[in-house]
Structures are given as C-alpha cells and as structure tokens.
C-alpha cells in the first residue's frame, strides 16, 4: 500500500475536516490523509532540507478498540511519535477515522495491531512512527502536572493583537539567563474548520532575557489565527529564534483533545530533550 499526498495548492482543504463523514468500523488505512509540512514552512523561510529544529509530534489516543481472535473487544490507550523531520503531518480527523476503523477488525494480539498502525502511519508521514499501545487491562498510568518554570498568565498586560505579531517579541538588557516560561493562554483555530484549539505552551531557552510581557502578548496574538497545532509551534519557535536570538531554544505545546486525540508538538535546537508525556490539566 502506498499513500501519497494530494497534489493541489493546499491539500488541507481537501481533507475530511469540516465535511460530513461516514464512519467505517473495519480496517481502512486509506482513510489517513497526509499533508506536506513544507506548505506552511515556506511561509517561515524553512526548508525540509535545512530545518532549524529537531523534535516530534506526540499524539495521545484515548479511544482505541479492536476485536481479539474470538471477537471480544479490547480497549487501549496509545501514543504515536511523529518525527518533526517527516515530510508530512497527518490530518487529525483522518487519524481519528483511521483509528475508528479498527473497532470491528480482528487481530490476534496487541503486537499485530501496533505493527499495523506503525506501518500505515509511517507510510502516511513518510518517516518511521513509534507506536505504543497499552491495554486498559494492564492498568496504564498517566500523570497530570505543570512545568517546572515561570507562569506568565498573571502578568497585568493590555492585549489588542489577535493575529501573530512577531514584533511583540524582544529581549531585555542584562546577562544571559536560562529559564522556562509557560502560559495556558495559547488559543488558535483549526486551519480548515475554524474550530478553537486550546493549549499550554512552554518556552525554554538560554540567552538574553526575553521580555515576559511581550512574550505573553505574542502568545495571545494567536487567538484568531488559523493554523494546525504543529504549524503554530513551528511559527512560535521561528519567531522567537529570529527576534530574540537565544543560544538554545525549545518550544512545546500541549493541546486539548478532540475526537479522542490530543497533539503535543515539540521543537528544539537540539540542546533540550523532549519532555515526558505529562498531561496538562485540560487534557
């Protein structure tokens, strides 16, 4: 099976998003809809051949089920790690529909399900995807927490920009610092449907002190912006990198779930490892 991207100016508008959907309950890998990352990266002056970051998109799936060889349902949670250097991202509704197609499909064991998903998702993304499935019968654990850093949200600021405004970003005089700043106020909208997407965003860096009030205004400026989760994080990373010129930088966002999935993009200059999979309270 070969999955290819649709050759139109913006394939996101040909995706299942915002369209009436017939749900399939038998295995259907053709439901996966890849979208080239380069389409939006070009707006930022980024090329796939010379990425300024490393990272991944960590997906958590909370509504996974299939049948065992005797027809008895199995339920599980799953994580899917999509590398940031994959040629394509996977459109989220198509991902949900694909996972739903396992509901009435029979597999001998969980390893067979994992291998099938890894094969299909890797073909769609154009790079190897790491799949981890945990049946609920094994009592998988999850943790909820907040970053070890400084919350920006109590700053008493005035906001009047609701489209991304890189000019709001600036550094302050002084010695270099290394710190983690975070906010729960990131809100953007789906590129296709306009539905609101809510997230916590975490910025870790080393360099000249970033003006915190300006950073929070910048985060708020995404409020009416239409873009996929992964693209928003890359835009934030790129704008901070250009405007503030930190020595090292990492940007991580944890978006609330939709359709049984949440997406948690992470981008870094390579000096900071991806954080563990601790949920934000709204997840």
Swiss-Prot record:
Keyword NADP part of the UniProt annotation: yes
Keyword NADP listed: yes
Binding site for substrate: 90-92, 229-230
Record-level GO BP terms: queuosine biosynthetic process; tRNA modification
An MF annotation (GO) of this entry: preQ1 synthase activity
UniProt catalytic activity: 7-aminomethyl-7-carbaguanine + 2 NADP(+) = 7-cyano-7-deazaguanine + 2 NADPH + 3 H(+)
Active site: 190, 197
Record localization: Cytoplasm
Pathway membership: tRNA modification; tRNA-queuosine biosynthesis
Residues given in the record as NADPH binding sites: 92-93, 258-259
Keyword list, A-Z: Cytoplasm, NADP, Oxidoreductase, Queuosine biosynthesis
Transmembrane segments: none
Any one GO cellular component localisation term in the record: cytoplasm
Enzyme's top EC category: oxidoreductase
UniProt EC number: 1.7.1.13
Family according to the record: Belongs to the GTP cyclohydrolase I family. QueF type 2 subfamily.
Subunit annotation: Homodimer.
Function description: Catalyzes the NADPH-dependent reduction of 7-cyano-7-deazaguanine (preQ0) to 7-aminomethyl-7-deazaguanine (preQ1).
Name of protein: NADPH-dependent 7-cyano-7-deazaguanine reductase
Lineage: Bacteria, Pseudomonadati, Pseudomonadota, Betaproteobacteria, Rhodocyclales
